[in-house]
Amino acid sequence: MRGPIVLHICLAFCSLLLFSVATQCLAFPKIERRREIAHVHAEKGQSDKMNTDDLENSSVTSKQTPQLVVSEDPMMMSAVPSATSLNKAFSINKETQPGQAGLMQTERPGVSTPTESGVPSAEEVFGSSQPERISPESGLAKAMLTIAITATPSLTVDEKEELLTSTNFQPIVEEITETTKGFLKYMDNQSFATESQEGVGLGHSPSSYVNTKEMLTTNPKTEKFEADTDHRTTSFPGAESTAGSEPGSLTPDKEKPSQMTADNTQAAATKQPLETSEYTLSVEPETDSLLGAPEVTVSVSTAVPAASALSDEWDDTKLESVSRIRTPKLGDNEETQVRTEMSQTAQVSHEGMEGGQPWTEAAQVALGLPEGETHTGTALLIAHGNERSPAFTDQSSFTPTSLMEDMKVSIVNLLQSTGDFTESTKENDALFFLETTVSVSVYESEADQLLGNTMKDIITQEMTTAVQEPDATLSMVTQEQVATLELIRDSGKTEEEKEDPSPVSDVPGVTQLSRRWEPLATTISTTVVPLSFEVTPTVEEQMDTVTGPNEEFTPVLGSPVTPPGIMVGEPSISPALPALEASSERRTVVPSITRVNTAASYGLDQLESEEGQEDEDEEDEEDEDEEEEDEEEDEEDKDADSLDEGLDGDTELPGFTLPGITSQEPGLEEGNMDLLEGATYQVPDALEWEQQNQGLVRSWMEKLKDKAGYMSGMLVPVGVGIAGALFILGALYSIKVMNRRRRNGFKRHKRKQREFNSMQDRVMLLADSSEDEF
């Protein structure tokens, strides 16, 4: 039984991967450009705030591989369980040329300036252009990894200028497994919409990290980065930076599978998952680094370390917006629900860990980001739900997604993934405090920052048009960021996919970025779902409050705010995770996790029905084509038959014309019959005979061919059958004969023996008798 089951599982998995890749490829082209633009805008807005956020975030970065690059500031890449660099990745290589595969810059002081911080990571990873350059799969995977790495450097806040160089990151990317590649692809599209969009680099890399969890993608580099992650222990204000201390926790996440130095990077990741998220945000500001275009590091692939953290459940609980983002990219619910997967993984990995906390950190980071930096980061996270690998989830989010001009919240979503990382998350519970509560009406996102201050951004969600042109794309300040969300349609689907928040991850609420879009309330679903990128109203399900470590819970987000027409799921609050780290701060982060199941203004039903109709239409068309072909064949057969009949009729002495008579038709007038009586038939000339004969021969040949073809087709099987039967009969008969002979021979032998014995007996008797006589 085991063999068949394993085979089926393998086949299903392979088909899933192929399907996801295909869908991503289809979806990328349209969405890519908008996202890039959105990313750039978001990054610009964020860069201002970046410094503070970066500082906060820097504490954790060290452990994660991504962190390698950015030891401290790198938004605690390490925190991300698998190649936490995800978040870091956002800061796309500011300096690195898009063409270059990051890594160019070993080290980036970028920390000092907000923009700079984002850059280092980007450079290290590689220009956003890299994704384009890379083959779809490999390129994506690389892009993701690199991005994640980039994010770290950028995360390294100004204060944490120490962030290490990320030169190592590139190799990681290469190692990404195929699955990661697929996810990365998606990320690439979203994060690095185009080479030119380098700035936008957006850390899809987080998703790649998630992958690492699955595929170790980032591992090679992670090992290199271990040291960095270690030293970056900086803790957020509320959270303990135990970046180095908890290597193990991350590994549970799925980091282990990743080659990354499981312990170091993982530990860092676990401890700094939240931080990583924050850093991610800070990275976002690095819009300019690469092309001078905003890098929109916002990308912040929150999914980052918690490769699985972004699972749909997570998104629901953590990031409403993320969940929105997470559209079923592959149409596969599980996959589409990036959150669920991520959260699942996160939960599994962290179980006891603060699975949710990393998210909170991310949320904080989001808040920390400059206003209007909201960022699609969260959306990106989800995008990769399909991949399922934690890294992937990260990937999904991309800057453009963020609706709110300044929603730090969106970053929070991205961070959500990080939250998945176990222990780090705990530490980062404090990070949770950032309550990215965005009420639909108010669009206010409150997040307590790591420092413990609460940042409230009232987001005027003017992005009524989620589908705005890329130009309007999410300039951070411009709330039109929604533009990037032209994907809106699919978003509806994503929302549907949103699953109940995973109770396991406490962070859900935190990560949950409340994202409100006025009109559509469409959440940007940046899910990897290549085909359908829809922005579903993130607003509806967005509200989630994250409590800062030092602050009391702010249940503000506790009750999900639902925009009109949006259904909200009951919020579930997960108990604060025990602080794995003995962090002094009370990180009773009890992000109230609200799961909102909101159907985009386009009802999910509508989307589904539309898709269903399309499928039906396609099927109908195929059926019609088949029927037409059958009809054509039938017509041809009929034509051939009629021809044959005509030929047969003609061949029976057709048309010899009698003298003076033009018509051979039977309906001749009686008047002409008299003429016919005395008429003598003329033998047709040679030409006529030839034509007639040819017609006869042709018809006969066709008939023969038809029958002979049928017969010839039957001859082989019939002949083989007969031969087989004869052979079997012959074998049986031969066996019978052989047995008979043997039997006869045996009998003969016995008879002879008997006779011989009797003769011997006689001789002996004679001898005895003779002796007696003597």
Swiss-Prot record:
Residues 258-275 have a biased composition (Polar residues). Glycans are attached at residues 57, 189. Interacts with IL6ST; this interaction prevents IL6ST protein homodimerization and bridges ARMH4 with IL6R and STAT3 and therefore inhibits phosphorylation of STAT3 at 'Tyr-705'. Interacts (via cytoplasmic tail) with RICTOR; this interaction bridges ARMH4 to the mTORC2 complex and inhibits the mTORC2 kinase activity. This is Armadillo-like helical domain-containing protein 4. It holds the Pfam family ARMH4. Keywords: Glycoprotein, Membrane, Phosphoprotein, Signal, Transmembrane, Transmembrane helix. May modulate immune response and may play a role in inflammation. Down-modulates STAT3 signaling throught direct interaction with IL6ST, resulting in the inhibition of phosphorylation of STAT3 at 'Tyr-705'. May negatively regulates AKT signaling by modulating the activity of mTORC2 complex through RICTOR interaction. Residues 736-774 are cytoplasmic. One of its GO terms (biological process) is regulation of TORC2 signaling. It is a single-pass type I membrane protein. Residues 607-651 have a biased composition (Acidic residues). Residues 1-27 form the signal peptide. GO terms for cellular component: membrane. Residues 28-714 are extracellular.
